[in-house]
Each structure stands twice: as C-alpha cells, then as structure tokens.
Amino acid sequence: MPGLVDSNPAPPESQEKKPLKPCCACPETKKARDACIIEKGEEHCGHLIEAHKECMRALGFKI
C-alpha cells in the first residue's frame, strides 16, 4: 500500500565495511563538548572534553 513506512530498515552495513572515522564517533558527547566550548570557553568544559575522550577511547581511538 502506498504511504506505509517500510518496517525493515536497512542493516548498518557502513560500520561493518568501513572503519569508523573520528569525526563521526560519539556524536552526543561531541555535540555537548562543542556547544560548551563555544558558549563558555574551553577552560570551563573540561568534564565534557574528558567524557568525549573516554567515549572515543571506548571505540578504540588512541587519544
């Protein structure tokens, strides 16, 4: 029927075939970190910067 949403989403093949790029990893912590740095300055966002680093390390990035 037209107008129905496909209930079978495409499998996440991109992560299986291509390695995750640092720019695409941890989008939640990256967004929070970047917003804090822009609004308050890097010196006030250490906890968010560290949280993003921990997330990146958990995904295998060496930071």
Swiss-Prot record:
Residues the record lists as N6-acetyllysine modifications: K18, K30
The record's account of how the chain is modified after translation: Acetylation by KAT8 promotes assembly of the mitochondrial respiratory chain complex IV (CIV).
Main location: mitochondrion
GO terms of molecular function: copper chaperone activity; copper ion binding; cuprous ion binding; enzyme activator activity
Keywords assigned by UniProt, alphabetized: Acetylation, Chaperone, Copper, Cytoplasm, Disulfide bond, Metal-binding, Mitochondrion, Phosphoprotein
Residues with PTM Phosphoserine: S14
One GO BP: generation of precursor metabolites and energy
Gene3D superfamilies: CytochromE C oxidase copper chaperone
Motif segment (Cx9C motif 1): 26-36
A Gene Ontology term for the protein's cellular component: cytoplasm
Sequence motif Cx9C motif 2, location on chain: 45-55
Assembly with partners or alone: Interacts with COA1. Interacts with the chaperone CHCHD4; this is important for correct folding and the formation of disulfide bonds that stabilize the structure.
Record's function text: Copper metallochaperone essential for the assembly of the mitochondrial respiratory chain complex IV (CIV), also known as cytochrome c oxidase. Binds two copper ions and delivers them to the metallochaperone SCO1 which transports the copper ions to the Cu(A) site on the cytochrome c oxidase subunit II (MT-CO2/COX2).
PANTHER family xref list: CYTOCHROME C OXIDASE COPPER CHAPERONE
Family listed: Belongs to the COX17 family.
Protein name: Cytochrome c oxidase copper chaperone
